[in-house]
Curated annotation (Swiss-Prot):
Family of the protein in this entry: Belongs to the glycosyl hydrolase 27 family.
Record PTM Phosphoserine, positions in chain: 322, 332
Pfam family, one: Melibiase_2_C
Coiled-coil parts of chain: none
Binding site for substrate: 78-79, 154, 188, 213, 217
Subcellular location field: Lysosome
Species classification: Eukaryota, Metazoa, Chordata, Craniata, Vertebrata
Reaction equations catalysed: Cleavage of non-reducing alpha-(1->3)-N-acetylgalactosamine residues from human blood group A and AB mucin glycoproteins, Forssman hapten and blood group A lacto series glycolipids; a neolactoside IV(3)-alpha-GalNAc,IV(2)-alpha-Fuc-nLc4Cer(d18:1(4E)) + H2O = a neolactoside IV(2)-alpha-Fuc-nLc4Cer(d18:1(4E)) + N-acetyl-alpha-D-galactosamine; a neolactoside IV(3)-alpha-GalNAc,IV(2)-alpha-Fuc-nLc4Cer(d18:0) + H2O = a neolactoside IV(2)-alpha-Fuc-nLc4Cer(d18:0) + N-acetyl-alpha-D-galactosamine; a globoside IV3GalNAc-Gb4Cer + H2O = N-acetyl-alpha-D-galactosamine + a globoside Gb4Cer
Keyword Hydrolase: yes
Free-text function comment from the UniProt entry: Removes terminal alpha-N-acetylgalactosamine residues from glycolipids and glycopeptides. Required for the breakdown of glycolipids.
Subunit relationships: Homodimer.
Family matches, as PANTHER family: ALPHA-GALACTOSIDASE/ALPHA-N-ACETYLGALACTOSAMINIDASE, ALPHA-N-ACETYLGALACTOSAMINIDASE
Identification of the protein by name: Alpha-N-acetylgalactosaminidase
Length: 411
């Protein structure tokens, strides 16, 4: 009997694991919510309402303006697409706003070399009051999404109980697996449980989800960015070890290109999200985005760092009385990303330090490339003093890599 029990538990664990092999690096793409919310007024605002046309136009921009080629491949529908359920209980899109249906949209997106994401909610209703996915609908909805050739599912948690979430998220992971279609799974579960143990089991989440929202929704303001960043830093000892290839912490969307951030703050969010190994999911109007903001989001070295195959989430390693913070992320080939972040609100600050003060040791000579300016800083040893000038609410970001090991060269 004991052997049977062990075998049964092993089978259950195997079924529950989201064994899709996806998102070995953080996902990159575009998500509708932050910029376009639940705008369903297509009569008065046809260019900006949640509709088939909006997603097709964003897909065009992603394919034609360099986004896809830089790695931004997911085009994700959020709330307010659902029109109801048909007589057999299958979800249907709003017929007026998505007249050709989701399979048509998926085919269009795929024809451009992109992937389509969709939204559902573990509960009676979505957050905006559309039909949700109750426990008895989980398998059916997973099958529907697979038949529609969807590539990612974001499962929200409004209007559900802790018990329903505890059953529903693992059940959806198993149901997605059972479809045979690789569908990346974005879980909002921990955000509804306070984001921390013991109410959140991150070992389980890593088995059943490819990414998960831990904390509050981002809003279009610098205060919102800081509140999310500070929460992640406060709990980094818990959060940092659980992220890795195939399973990522998600501090929510990038605001860059919208209305609430200055240029310095936009550069800061991009750098900080990158050092946290966060998903890079834009939520802006790609039809009107400025060249300046495109440069931030399409920075090749930034994207290389974000997509580093080691998949190690970075940490804050220093917090100075001067309101300067330093973040570090280990990268492949013994390289590192360093972010010098100013929480000041007065004027540019001259920050003096050395690699030794930042816990780099050993007889190694480093070179650093400034991720935004492209400048190269050569001849850095652990005892070499350097100065970076950081603008208020801004960053200086380095890609730091070893060029010579003095001990090995002396042998």
């Amino acid at each position: 009997m004991l052997l049977k029990t062990v075998l049964l538990l092993g089978h259950v664990a195997q079924v529950l694991m989201l064994d899709n092999g996806l998102l070995q690096t953080p996902p990159m793409g575009w998500l509708a919510w932050e910029r376009f919310r639940c705008n369903i007024n297509c009569d008065e605002d046809p260019k900006n309402c949640i509709s088939e046309q909006l997603f097709m136009e964003m897909a065009d921009r992603m394919a034609q303006d360099g986004w896809r080629d830089m790695g931004y491949t997911y085009l994700n529908i959020d709330d307010c697409w659902i029109g109801g359920r048909d007589a057999s209980g299958r979800l249907m899109p709003d017929p007026k706003r998505f007249p050709h249906g989701i399979p048509f949209l998926a085919d269009y997106v795929h024809s451009l070399g992109l992937k389509l994401g969709i939204y559902a909610d573990m509960g009676n209703f979505t957050c905006m009051g559309y039909p949700g996915t109750t426990l008895d609908k989980v398998v059916q909805d997973a099958q529907t999404f697979a038949e529609w050739k969807v590539d990612m599912l974001k499962l929200d948690g409004c209007f559900s109980t802790p018990e329903e979430r505890a059953q529903g998220y693992p059940k959806m992971a198993a149901a997605l697996n059972a479809t045979g279609r690789p569908i990346a799974f974005s879980c909002s579960w921990p955000a509804y449980e306070g984001g921390l143990p013991p109410r959140v089991n991150y070992s389980l989440l890593a088995d059943i989800c490819n990414l998960w929202r831990n904390y509050d929704d981002i809003q279009d303001s610098w205060w919102s960015v800081l509140s999310i960043l500070n929460w992640f830093v406060e709990h980094q000892d818990i959060l940092q070890p659980v992220a890795g290839p195939g399973h990522w912490n998600d501090p929510d969307m990038l605001l860059i290109g919208n209305f609430g951030l200055s240029l310095e703050q936009s550069r800061a969010q991009m750098a900080l999200w990158t050092v946290l190994a966060a998903p890079l999911l834009m939520s802006t109007d790609l039809r009107t985005i400025s060249a300046q903001n495109m440069d931030i989001l399409q920075n090749p070295l930034m994207i290389k760092i974000n997509q580093d195959p080691l998949g190690i989430q970075g940490r804050r390693i220093h917090k100075e009385k001067s309101l300067i913070e330093v973040y570090m992320r280990p990268l492949s080939n013994k390289a590192s990303a360093l972010v010098f972040f100013s929480c000041r609100t007065d004027m540019p600050y001259r920050y003096h330090s050395s690699l030794g003060q930042l816990n780099f040791t050993g007889s190694v000579i480093y070179e650093a490339q400034d991720v935004y300016s492209g400048d190269i800083i050569s001849g850095l040893r652990d005892e070499t003093n350097f100065t970076v000038i950081i603008n208020p609410s801004g960053v200086v970001m380095w890609y730091l890599y070893p060029i010579k090991n003095l001990e090995m060269s002396q042998q």
